[in-house]
Amino acid sequence: MTQLNDLPLQSLQFYATAPYPCSYLPQRQARSQVATPGHLIQSDIYSDLVTKGFRRSGMFTYRPYCDGCQACTPLRIVVDGFRPDRSQKRAVARHGKLQTRVLRLCFVPEHYQLYLRYQNGRHAGGGMDHDSIDQYTQFLLQSRVNSRLVEFREVDDTGATGGPGVLKMVSLLDLLDDGLSAVYTFYEPEPRCSYGTYNVLWQIAQARALSLPHVYLGYWIAVSPKMNYKAGFHPHEILTDGRWHRVDMPL
């Protein structure tokens, strides 16, 4: 367990939740360690917590605290030295013409409708496919840290259609002291698309432009098919036994 006795983390308290069904491994129970009080967790403290394996969901800052299981491994991409592989290059070729717009956190009905299509198309029956506007807002639009929404739109090359273009993807990210943190991304559930991969590549490019060394992808679970893609970005680092360990691309 990472030590949390360094200032300013001494001002925080940490408690463990009751067990609840694991979202990633069937037949498993999960627990989380939650950092409180929330009003003290501003951008600087949150940046420190992320380096120690914490994430946030809305206003809650947490990390896995499961009994007898350590499958969730924090993973961050090392921006300096990153080189895309063939499949990642194909994602850029497929989606590289998407136009982006960065927004402060705000409710946009078009985003919410895309979110519902994504949940129903990619995670039907997962419990989020019928989220209300309030649930969506609490999950994605509440933050005490430096957060942004990023729109990705497909625009007609001819410009004949006018307007902002067709919304294809929305990403929520946090700006940390040492990188970007990919909080959540949802997109049009089209067959043979690579929106998720392209989004990570876009964040790597943004981090490089901002001279930030890392892109945090949250938790990687080696035995979860949903999480396998995270380990495909090299070099990356994983947090084990309280220390970050580098993983380079296999030869």
Swiss-Prot record:
Keywords: Acyltransferase, Cytoplasm, Transferase. GO terms for cellular component: cytoplasm. Its main location: cytoplasm. Pfam families: ATE_C, ATE_N. Its EC number is 2.3.2.29. One of its GO terms (biological process) is ubiquitin-dependent protein catabolic process via the N-end rule pathway. Signal peptide: none annotated. It catalyses: N-terminal L-glutamyl-[protein] + L-leucyl-tRNA(Leu) = N-terminal L-leucyl-L-glutamyl-[protein] + tRNA(Leu) + H(+); N-terminal L-aspartyl-[protein] + L-leucyl-tRNA(Leu) = N-terminal L-leucyl-L-aspartyl-[protein] + tRNA(Leu) + H(+). It is found in: Cytoplasm. InterPro entries: Acyl_CoA_acyltransferase, Asp_Glu_LeuTrfase, N-end_Aminoacyl_Trfase, N-end_Aminoacyl_Trfase_C, N-end_Aminoacyl_Trfase_N. SUPFAM superfamilies: Acyl-CoA N-acyltransferases (Nat). The keyword Cytoplasm applies. The keyword Coiled coil does not apply. It is an enzyme of class 2 (transferase). Functions in the N-end rule pathway of protein degradation where it conjugates Leu from its aminoacyl-tRNA to the N-termini of proteins containing an N-terminal aspartate or glutamate. Belongs to the R-transferase family. Bpt subfamily. This is Aspartate/glutamate leucyltransferase. The lineage of its organism: Bacteria, Pseudomonadati, Pseudomonadota, Betaproteobacteria, Burkholderiales.
